[in-house]
Amino acid sequence: MNPNQKILFASATAIVIGTIAVLIGIVNLGLNIGLHLKPSCNCSRSQPEATNASQTIINNYYNKTNITQISNTNIQVEERASREFNNLTKGLCTINSWHIYGKDNAVRIGEDSDVLVTREPYVSCDPDECRFYALSQGTTIRGKHSNGTIHDRSQYRALISWPLSSPPTVYNSRVECIGWSSTSCHDGRARMSICISGPNNNASAVIWYNRRPVTEINTWARNILRTQESECVCHNGVCPVVFTDGSATGPAETRIYYFKEGKILKWEPLTGTAKHIEECSCYGEQARVTCTCRDNWQGSNRPVIQIDPVAMTHTSQYICSPVLTDNPRPNDPTVGKCNDPYPGNNNNGVKGFSYLDGGNTWLGRTISTASRSGYEMLKVPNALTDDRSKPTQGQTIVLNTDWSGYSGSFMDYWAEGECYRACFYVELIRGRPKEDRVWWTSNSIVSMCSSTEFLGQWNWPDGAKIEYFL
């Protein structure tokens, strides 16, 4: 063929191929339209009835990957709307020993990973899961900003949560609210989180509900407004929370606030015989909330607040038992005090907890009487009311050769069963002030839950070697 014929042949071939491609595309488009408009598919875009909204969404969009998250969101919204407020209808399960529940090894992993500096940790559950919580310092353990994180209050702290038994990292942590003191709890429908921030003489609390700010509370004594540092508890939507504002080494003003959906229903000043209240650890059962607190002013015995969330009233006293559970503390006396602080804490203390259930009562405390080291659980029947009650059983959680710290109670109120399983956590503090070869202060967490079996014990230390950080 001559050149002109070659050009004509090539052009004709291209036209034929292009025409075939267009026809294939038209056929493909027609098939797709036909498949999506077949009679068995409900393709209406109108708002589905509320009673079957999630099912309609799944039928319409189950095979569209880019819509999957929207479908899940709609399902979650409907489930949340249909959930009921949690009611504290059960009693505590019999406690014969404690089994391991969670451990995050945060400091060990933080030696070579982006783990956040935290303190004041706790555990809290909702109908779907339980998560670790803590106050972050806005830096990682290996970050240069970790220098000075021994200080409790700064603009860089936030309440974060992360999956159970994972370390808190910059990738898996969720910020709940901003502040240097906190509490958080779920009422069965949504979570309420409270964070306190600001200068010592002008701090304020912001109450979040369902991830939105709802209410604010201003300082009333202008001396470090503060709250529980562990989970609150809700009954039929009413969530009592204990706040203190005032001196840590003298008289302070404590209030119990009653919230519903983040809004204040009522507040009342502390009543009863407790003289000083800080950092309460609360649990709920049989339509009441019991909080074991810290008397930082005078008491080596712990004050207890018993709250009726239905009547929205409370009373307070001290644990009567001579088994003292604060730190520092003197040696256990022969007779305890029910309505007065037992002296010997030297204007100091540590957050702690107890489960006060008659003959099923267990108290937690550091093993050391002088420093935050070791941890043990002691069964002390009738400790709340008997001023001569003594331990009948015990379990070591952390040996006295290892550091401990704050501790607190929590329960999974949505777990199956005829009773509530008691649980607790222990903060394992590392770094300053005791380990001053490093510049930071942080912690890991170990948590345990009760068992009706008589289980063996083991040491559950933080486990990080400080020399690896030098």
From Swiss-Prot:
GO cellular component: host cell plasma membrane; membrane; virion membrane
Reactions it catalyzes: Hydrolysis of alpha-(2->3)-, alpha-(2->6)-, alpha-(2->8)- glycosidic linkages of terminal sialic acid residues in oligosaccharides, glycoproteins, glycolipids, colominic acid and synthetic substrates
Gene3D superfamilies, alphabetized: 2.120.10.10
Function as written in the Swiss-Prot or TrEMBL entry: Catalyzes the removal of terminal sialic acid residues from viral and cellular glycoconjugates. Cleaves off the terminal sialic acids on the glycosylated HA during virus budding to facilitate virus release. Additionally helps virus spread through the circulation by further removing sialic acids from the cell surface. These cleavages prevent self-aggregation and ensure the efficient spread of the progeny virus from cell to cell. Otherwise, infection would be limited to one round of replication.
Naturally occurring in which organism (per UniProt): Influenza A virus (strain A/Ruddy Turnstone/New Jersey/60/1985 H4N9)
Entry-listed glycosylation sites: N42, N52, N63, N66, N87, N147, N202
UniProt membrane topology term: Single-pass type II membrane protein
SUPFAM superfamilies: Sialidases
Chain sites annotated for binding substrate: R119, R153, E278, E279, R294, R372
Record text on activity regulation: Inhibited by the neuraminidase inhibitors zanamivir (Relenza) and oseltamivir (Tamiflu). These drugs interfere with the release of progeny virus from infected cells and are effective against all influenza strains. Resistance to neuraminidase inhibitors is quite rare.
Gene name in the database record: NA
Protein name: Neuraminidase
InterPro entries, A to Z: Glyco_hydro_34, Sialidase_Influenza_A/B, Sialidase_sf
Record localization: Virion membrane; Host apical cell membrane
Intravirion side: 1-6
Domain notes: Intact N-terminus is essential for virion morphogenesis. Possesses two apical sorting signals, one in the ectodomain, which is likely to be a glycan, and the other in the transmembrane domain. The transmembrane domain also plays a role in lipid raft association.
Leftover remarks: The influenza A genome consist of 8 RNA segments. Genetic variation of hemagglutinin and/or neuraminidase genes results in the emergence of new influenza strains. The mechanism of variation can be the result of point mutations or the result of genetic reassortment between segments of two different strains.
Post-translational modification (record): N-glycosylated.
Entry similarity comment: Belongs to the glycosyl hydrolase 34 family.
Entry keyword set: Calcium, Disulfide bond, Glycoprotein, Glycosidase, Host cell membrane, Host membrane, Hydrolase, Membrane, Metal-binding, Signal-anchor, Transmembrane, Transmembrane helix, Virion
Coiled-coil stretches noted in the UniProt entry, renumbered to this chain: none
